[in-house]
C-alpha cells in the first residue's frame, strides 16, 4: 500500500505553494479539560489509520464522554495531502488533527507554521527517548518546534522463505553482511535456479535505496540541510542494489501488484522491507502460513547497523482554538502515548508502534504462528531501537525526492555511472532548491 501511494504524495506535496512566512507560534498554557468538557474535534486520516483512530476514540470517550471525535477517512495519503494543501493555503476548513507521513511533516509545517501547535511543553520531557529514534528528526520543524508525535513505524527486516532456504541447505544465520547476502544468494540460485534470491521494483519508488541509506546513516540531506545524495555512503548504498542486479540475484517486480504476485507465487526467496509487509502477506497470502520468517537485514560491515526505517506516520495539532487544542492533545496522548492504545492499533490494524514502552509489554512479546511461532514482534522491537537517526527532510523534500527517483531509475535500469549520476543529481537539487552540496 505504501508503494502505491508514494507518487500521488510526491505530486500533491510538490504543488503546495509557499504559504505563511515563518513565524514562531506563541504557545500558551492550554485550558484544563475533564469529563465535563464538551467540545468536538475533527481528525483527518486515511484507510486503516483512520479506522484505528475510530477505535481509540471509543476508549478515549470513556474518560471524556462529552468530547466528540470525528474521524474523516480519506482514500489514501495522496488524496489527504492534496486536501491538506488546499485548506492550509486558504486557512479555511482546517481539521483539529492531521495525520502526516513522517517524511512529509516539514513539507506542511514549514510552509504553514502558524497552524502547527508546538507540542514540546505538552509531551513527556523524555519524548525523544521513548519513540522510534528515526522519527525524532522528522517530528521537529527548523525552528525546534515539536510539531508532530510519532505514531507507527516501519522497521526494516529481511523476510525470507524458510522452506526454500531449508531445501537449498542455506543457514540464514550465515547472512550477516551484504557480502554474505550476495555470496549466499549465488549459492541459493545455484541450487534453485527458478527462484530469484530477492525482488523489488526497479522503477518508480526509491524506497529500497532509502532503506539502505538510513541503515548506512545517510539520507538525501543532512542535519544542516546540505545535499548528501552524492556522498560516499549514498553511493555505497545504491551500489549494493546495482550489484544485486548485475549478479543476477534480483527480480524486477515493477510495482505493488507485481511484488505481491512474486512473493505469493514463490518467484523470490527474500524481500527486504518495512514491518507493515508482515500484515500484507498475512492478508494476501494466508496459505503461506509457516513458510515465512523474518530476520535482521544484512549490514554493510560486521559492526554495521542491521536496521532501517520504511514508512510510518505522525499526528499533528492544527487547531487554533485553545479548548480544541487541549482536547486534541488529550486524544493524541491517549492514542499514541499509551501502551494499551498502541497495542490495540497494532493487533487490530497492523500499525507497528513507534512508542517504545510497548516493546516491553508481555502482551506484545508473543509467538507468531504465521512466522512459524517466531517471536516476530520482539525482533521488530529490537530493530526499531537500533534504527540510525538519519532521516532529515525539509519543506522542499518533494523536489528532492522527484530528482532522487529519476536517478534511481537511471542507475538501476540504464546502467549509468553511479558517482557521475549522483553528482549530477546533487547539482540539480542545488540548482532547484538553493541548497549547498555537503563536502
Residue ranges and their predicted role:
Residues 184-187, 224-253, 297:
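Glycine-centered hinge/linker elements that transmit conformational signals in sensory
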Residues 86, 94-98, 125-164, 196, ...:
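A structural signal for short loop-to-beta-strand junctions that line the ligand-binding cleft
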Residues 35, 137, 295, 346-405, ...:
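Long, aromatic- and glycine/proline-rich binding clefts that accommodate carbohydrate-like moieties
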Residues 59-131, 167-169, 176, 267-270, ...:
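Extracytoplasmic "Venus flytrap"/periplasmic binding protein-like
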Residues 159-162, 310-323:
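A bilobed periplasmic-binding-protein/Venus flytrap-type ligand-binding module shared by bacterial periplasmic
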Residues 138, 142-151, 156, 179-226, ...:
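Extracytoplasmic/periplasmic solute-binding protein
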Residues 30, 101-157, 182, 212, ...:
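Hinge/lid segment of periplasmic solute-binding proteins
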Residues 36-48, 67-72, 96-97, 147, ...:
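Short, well-ordered beta-strand elements
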Amino acid at each position: 500500500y505504501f508503494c502505491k501511494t508514494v507518487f500521488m504524495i510526491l505530486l500533491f506535496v510538490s504543488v503546495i505553494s509557499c504559504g505563511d512566512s515563518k513565524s514562531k507560534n506563541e504557545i500558551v498554557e492550554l485550558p484544563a479539560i475533564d469529563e465535563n468538557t464538551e467540545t468536538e474535534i475533527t481528525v483527518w486520516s486515511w484507510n486503516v489509520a483512520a479506522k484505528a483512530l475510530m477505535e481509540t476514540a471509543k476508549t478515549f470517550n470513556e474518560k471524556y464522554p462529552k468530547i466528540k471525535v470525528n474521524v474523516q477517512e480519506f482514500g489514501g495519503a495522496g488524496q489527504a495531502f492534496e486536501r491538506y494543501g488546499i485548506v492550509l493555503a486558504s486557512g479555511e476548513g482546517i481539521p483539529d488533527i492531521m495525520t502526516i507521513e513522517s517524511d512529509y511533516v516539514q513539507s506542511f509545517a514549514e510552509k504553514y507554521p502558524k497552524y502547527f501547535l508546538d507540542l514540546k511543553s505538552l509531551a513527556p520531557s523524555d519524548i525523544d527517548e521513548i519513540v522510534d529514534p528515526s522519527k525524532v528528526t522528522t517530528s521537529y520543524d527548523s525552528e525546534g518546534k515539536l510539531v508532530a508525535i510519532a505514531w507507527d513505524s516501519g522497521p526494516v527486516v529481511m523476510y525470507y522463505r524458510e522452506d526454500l532456504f531449508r531445501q537449498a541447505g542455506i543457514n540464514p544465520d550465515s547472512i550477516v553482511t551484504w557480502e554474505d547476502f550476495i555470496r549466499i544468494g549465488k549459492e541459493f540460485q545455484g541450487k534453485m535456479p527458478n527462484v530469484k534470491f530477492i525482488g523489488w521494483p526497479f522503477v518508480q519508488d526509491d524506497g529500497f535505496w532509502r532503506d539502505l541509506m538510513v541503515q548506512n546513516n545517510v539520507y538525501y540531506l543532512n542535519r544542516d540541510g546540505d545535499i548528501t545524495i552524492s556522498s560516499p555512503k549514498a553511493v555505497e548504498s545504491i551500489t549494493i542494489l546495482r550489484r544485486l542486479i548485475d549478479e543476477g540475484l534480483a527480480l524486477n517486480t515493477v510495482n505493488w501488484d507485481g511484488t505481491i504476485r512474486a512473493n505469493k507465487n514463490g518467484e523470490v526467496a527474500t524481500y527486504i522491507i518495512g514491518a507493515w509487509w508482515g500484515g500484507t502477506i498475512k492478508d494476501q497470502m494466508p496459505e503461506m502460513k509457516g513458510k515465512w520468517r523474518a530476520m535482521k537485514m544484512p549490514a554493510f560491515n560486521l559492526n554495521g547497523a542491521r536496521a532501517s526505517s520504511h514508512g510510518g506516520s505522525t499526528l499533528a495539532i492544527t487547531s487554533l482554538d485553545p479548548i480544541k487544542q487541549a482536547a486534541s492533545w488529550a486524544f493524541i496522548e491517549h492514542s499514541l502515548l499509551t501502551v494499551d492504545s498502541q497495542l490495540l492499533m497494532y493487533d487490530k490494524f497492523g500499525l507497528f508502534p513507534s512508542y517504545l514502552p510497548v516493546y516491553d509489554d508481555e502482551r506484545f512479546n508473543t509467538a507468531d504462528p504465521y512466522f512459524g511461532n517466531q517471536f516476530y514482534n520482539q525482533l521488530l522491537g529490537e530493530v526499531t531501537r537500533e534504527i540510525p537517526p538519519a532521516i532529515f527532510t525539509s519543506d522542499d523534500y518533494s523536489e528532492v525526492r522527484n530528482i532522487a527517483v529519476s536517478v534511481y531509475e537511471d542507475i538501476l535500469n540504464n546502467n549509468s555511472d553511479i558517482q557521475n549520476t549522483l553528482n549530477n543529481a546533487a547539482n540539480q537539487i542545488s540548482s532547484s532548491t538553493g541548497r549547498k552540496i555537503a563536502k
